[in-house]
């Protein structure tokens, strides 16, 4: 799921998404549980 936060790196998303992890998209949004 998309999380509307401004990420700078995948690490930001992993912290925000929790154990399932996530990645930072080109639009600087986190995509969790991909």
UniProtKB/Swiss-Prot annotation:
<dbReference type="GO" id="GO:0005576">
    <property type="term" value="C:extracellular region"/>
</dbReference>
<protein>
    <recommendedName>
        <fullName>Buthinin</fullName>
    </recommendedName>
</protein>
<keyword id="KW-0044">Antibiotic</keyword>
<keyword id="KW-1015">Disulfide bond</keyword>
<keyword id="KW-0929">Antimicrobial</keyword>
<dbReference type="GO" id="GO:0042742">
    <property type="term" value="P:defense response to bacterium"/>
</dbReference>
<keyword id="KW-0964">Secreted</keyword>
<comment type="function">
    <text>Active against both Gram-positive and Gram-negative bacteria.</text>
</comment>
């Amino acid at each position: 799921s998309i999380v509307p936060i401004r990420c700078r790196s995948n690490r930001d998303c992993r912290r925000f998404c929790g154990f399932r992890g996530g990645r930072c998209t080109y639009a600087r949004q986190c995509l969790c549980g991909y």
